[in-house]
Amino acid sequence: MTNSFQNSRRDLRERAFQALFNIEMGAELLAASQFAYGYDKVTREDAQVLELPIFLLSLVTGVNNHKEELDNLISTHLKKGWSLERLTLTDKTLLRLGLFEIKYFDETPDRVALNEIIEVAKKYSDETSAKFINGLLSQYVSEAPSANKS
């Protein structure tokens, strides 16, 4: 991985997904974020705590702090017969992350946030899940475009 990719917003979204997934498995927020950001950057001889990018911390902290609200939004956009509990942890985490950025990051256009989370979904899930995530987030964006930013 090049340094420019490691510090790109796409890479930081991917690392936020990894941290959030680890938090769901019981990890502490800061430790999960530090590991997700630094696991491939630090060698044993050069072990040091890396300064976490604000964008990464904002995503992880924001999703974690708004999880109940995000889960309610996801639930309201699920088709009849589906529940949040039926979704895989990967899909739930990706949906939370995508919804959070769409809803709370004014500097990121909704379509950019949507496309970026779909790219992460393609890497960590299958094509069916990526299409499902795309459909749910697209529905959210199209239903209330002016009300999505809080």
Curated annotation (Swiss-Prot):
Record SUPFAM superfamilies: NusB-like
Keywords: RNA-binding, Transcription, Transcription antitermination, Transcription regulation
Cellular component terms per the entry's GO annotation: cytosol
HAMAP family xref list: NusB (MF_00073)
UniProt function note: Involved in transcription antitermination. Required for transcription of ribosomal RNA (rRNA) genes. Binds specifically to the boxA antiterminator sequence of the ribosomal RNA (rrn) operons.
One Pfam family this sequence matches: NusB
Alphabetical GO biological process terms: DNA-templated transcription termination; transcription antitermination
The protein, known as: Transcription antitermination protein NusB
Similarity-based family: Belongs to the NusB family.
Claim: RNA-binding is one of the keywords in the record: yes
GO molecular function: RNA binding
